[in-house]
Every structure is written in C-alpha cells, then in structure tokens.
Amino acid sequence: MDDLTAQALKDFTARYCDAWHEEHKSWPLSEELYGVPSPCIISTTEDAVYWQPQPFTGEQNVNAVERAFDIVIQSTIHTFYTTQFAGDMHAQFGDIKLTLLQTWSEDDFRRVQENLIGHLVTQKRLKLPPTLFIATLEEELEVISVCNLSGEVCKETLGTRKRTHLASNLAEFLNQLKPLL
C-alpha cells in the first residue's frame, strides 16, 4: 500500500466530512446512494443516507484489473480504491470541479474494477496510453485519471490523446483538493 496516497485520501476525506459537518451539522448525506447497502451508512431518511467513511475490508488490490490485461497497475491506484469505503465526494482542484470516486461497498468495488477494465479495453482498442480514472467531471467525456505509465494525474478527454497534466502523483493531487459541498 502506498502510505502517502492513503494518508492524502484520508486527509481529504476528513476535510470533506469536516466541511459538511460545519455547514450541515451532520455527516455527509447522499440521495444517489439511497437503497444501496454499505458499511458506511449511519442512518437513512425517506430518500437519502447519511454516511461516514469506513476501513476497506476486502483484498487491498485491484488485481482483477491486472489479470484482465496482464499488466502491473500503479500502486497508487490499488491504494486509492482500497483505503476506505466512502461516498463519492465533490471537490475542486484549481478551477476544476470534480466528483472524486470512491468504493461504497465490496459489491461496488467489483463494479469499479469492471469499469476500469472496460476503460482500459477502449484505450487499448484506440491505441491510447493506459490511464485509470479516479474522478468524473461535469463534461461527460472528461475524467481525472492516473497515467499507468508515469503515475501522474491528468485531466483526460475520453477516446482521445488530449490530456492535461494536473499533478506529478496522486498524493500531490489529493493534497491540493478542496471540498465542494
């Protein structure tokens, strides 16, 4: 496990939860995750769940992705998706507004790995360098990804070679995120 990435993710999650508590006097609330089982759920309303992060309980790797492509995945990606269970968190990096993706449960973790495999299949078909997404943007064709060759974080337009460098590594990126409620 990459300790710098794990700590940066935990620190951002704490900043996010603290900001939520400061503004709403509660743990984060999600309508999107209502009805989806998770160890993160504290309580449920008629149409939403209050959640708090919980330690990840499965195998701490994305080996299913590695096996599917017979490649080695950046250790930071293993760490990012297996440090904790949490709800997705809205954030800002410079002037970029994003939704930081998280795994909500062990079932969700399997789904995330399947989506990462699908992403890599498309990149391989288009002969693009491999990246692994960590966040979504309002523009559906853009994501924040980690380059599997260099470990750098970039803003990527899906299906193209268009990439904008954002940070040298995932810990640096996470440390610069600001919670957005």
Swiss-Prot record:
Its main location: membrane. It is a peripheral membrane protein. The keyword Protease does not apply. It comes from Shigella boydii serotype 18 (strain CDC 3083-94 / BS512). This is Protein Syd. Interacts with the SecY protein in vivo. May bind preferentially to an uncomplexed state of SecY, thus functioning either as a chelating agent for excess SecY in the cell or as a regulatory factor that negatively controls the translocase function. It is found in: Cell inner membrane. The keyword ATP-binding does not apply. Keywords: Cell inner membrane, Cell membrane, Membrane. Belongs to the Syd family. It comes from the Bacteria.
